[in-house]
Design a protein with these regions (language model features):
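Short, solvent-exposed helix-loop connector elements
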Residues: 231-234, 345-359, 370-382, 402, ...
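Amphipathic alpha-helical blocks
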Residues: 73, 83-108
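Core structural elements
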Residues: 55, 60, 108-110, 117, ...
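A conserved non-catalytic segment of reverse transcriptases
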Residues: 220, 296-362, 366-368
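Conserved polymerase palm-domain catalytic core
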Residues: 98-113, 117, 149-313
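Extended C-terminal regions of large enzymes
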Residues: 393, 402-468
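Short secondary-structure subsegments characteristic of cysteine-rich extracellular domains
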Residues: 377-400
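Non-catalytic, polymerase-adjacent accessory regions of viral genome-replication enzymes
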Residues: 1-87
Length: 468
């Protein structure tokens, strides 16, 4: 596979090969390797030759593997990730030549809508797999350059950082006495980024005009929405590998302004919280930082959703905060709890047609994932209550699956219920949910039996994170 990829992504035929003594003349200039079919050629690059670094075979090979690993649906050309390699074998030379001479034109992204928790739709733009390959190559090259510039209080879409780091950072700030929050809400951030402002910010660091031009082409590539082409005058469509990096580059200007003012904050993508020691100070910060965002960055602040509040109960990344004995604690926000319960209800519904094995698998996957994300929260009591509710749901599913009276009676007897009680309950006209909560079904299908059958529990998953 490695040799195949080298042949697929190698380019620059006839590039002159330098010996080691000649390369010593490039003092202070970074180099990369062109892997050709016949030899390895070392080519110098600097800040004005960033494009050569982006399209280097090693970088493109990594980008190819990343796109293949991430999978994802096809773009407007309907090319799948599996079809990418044959296409590259036939068109690699033309692709790299078009990137070098500036004739490369990205395809419009495919509009995809996914529902949000608030009932609205999140708009995604899915690039073609070849555009994803090039975007990924750009992202891999620019990320280490910009990582040196990004704030340590920015956590979204960055290497070795995540939501839990942002939450721990917020806890430390609250522990230092900053107990009032400006919960900043940027209105449709990814859809309203100013292209001219973003290009201006990029130009401060990227001195290779060809790379700036290529990024600009992606920003203005347009959208195919239900077969109709729409221009993209603003925004960085979510869905491509480059969008998260561009959003961080844009909002790094906000980070720098907050740092300059000495204001503690945490930011995960476009989700920011600024902390103050008093409510009056927080209100002043809200007004002044809104002016900066709208005036300098040309972004829109949702004034109705941007709130100033005491830290208790504020929702951030699915968690909420409270202070106990002078220390900031985390709990699961009420909306996240309700969403989890609705999902468990869906997974234990008889209408999905799953058998016992499939239901166990789906429940275990969801429970482990959910508890894995929320394991920072103090939630033992909540999980114990939810486990009781979940076991009742499972008993209801099992009771429903028995269907016929004869089957119900026979299975109750097998589970240790005497024949008379089994006959009474097998013929009962009570609803499924009421019977699932009855003492008879709790005796017949005990917690231990459910556990032995392989049904996962929330507390069981939580104990794996907190063994003591």
């Amino acid at each position: 596979m490695k040799e195949r990829m080298q042949k697929t992504l190698a380019e620059v035929k006839g590039c002159p090969q330098k010996d080691r003594t000649e390369s010593e003349g490039y003092v202070g200039v970074q180099t990369f390797m062109w892997i050709c079919e016949d030899n390895i050629v070392e080519v110098p690059f600097d800040k004005e030759h960033l494009l050569e670094r982006i399209i280097s075979p090693d970088n493109l090979r990594k980008a190819y593997k990343a796109v293949l690993r991430n999978k994802g649906c096809s773009g407007i050309d309907k090319m799948s990730c599996e079809q990418m390699l044959p296409w590259l074998l036939a068109n690699k030379d033309a692709l790299i030549r078009s990137l070098l001479d500036g004739s490369y034109r990205p395809n419009p992204v495919k509009r995809v809508e996914i529902p949000k928790d608030n009932g609205k739709m999140r708009l995604l733009g899915i690039p073609t797999v070849i555009d994803r390959l090039v975007q990924q190559a750009i992202n891999q090259t620019l990320t280490p350059i910009y990582e040196r510039q990004f704030s340590p209080r920015s956590y979204g879409f960055r290497p070795r950082r995540g939501c839990h780091d942002a939450l721990r950072g917020a806890q430390k700030i609250v522990d230092d006495g900053y107990i009032y929050v400006v919960d900043l809400d940027l209105e449709r951030f990814f859809d309203t980024v100013s292209h001219s402002k973003l290009i201006e910010i990029l130009s401060h660091t990227i001195k290779d005009g060809r790379v700036i031009s290529l990024i600009h082409k992606y920003l203005r590539s347009g959208v195919m929405n239900k077969g109709m082409f729409e221009t993209s005058e603003e925004g960085t469509p979510q869905g491509g590998p480059l969008s998260p990096l561009l959003s961080n580059i844009m909002l790094n200007e906000l980070d720098k302004e907050l740092t300059r003012r000495g204001l503690p904050f945490v930011r995960y993508a476009d989700d920011s919280m600024i902390f103050c020691k008093s409510k009056r100070a927080a209100k002043r910060v809200k007004e002044s930082i809104t002016r900066f965002i709208e005036g300098k960055l040309h972004l829109k602040v949702n004034r109705d959703k941007t709130i100033v509040s005491y830290v208790k109960g504020v929702k951030y990344l699915g968690y909420s905060f409270y202070v106990m004995k002078g220390k900031c604690q985390l709990t699961v926000h009420a909306k996240a709890k309700a969403k989890m319960k609705a999902k468990l209800k869906e997974l234990t519904s008889r209408s999905n047609g799953w058998g016992y094995a499939k239901r166990k698998q789906k429940l275990e996957e969801y429970i482990k994932g959910w508890v894995g994300y929320y394991h920072l929260a103090n939630m033992k009591r909540f999980l114990i209550e939810m486990d009781e509710w979940l076991r009742r749901r499972l008993r209801m599913c099992i009771w429903k699956s028995w269907k016929r009276v004869k089957t119900k009676v026979a299975n109750l007897v097998k589970c240790g219920i005497d024949k008379y009680q089994a006959y009474l309950w097998g013929n009962s006209r009570l609803g499924y949910w009421r019977i699932a909560g009855s003492y008879i079904l709790s005796r017949a299908i005990t917690n231990e039996k459910l556990s032995m059958a392989g049904y996962a529990t929330l507390m069981g998953a939580y104990i794996e994170w907190h063994p003591k």
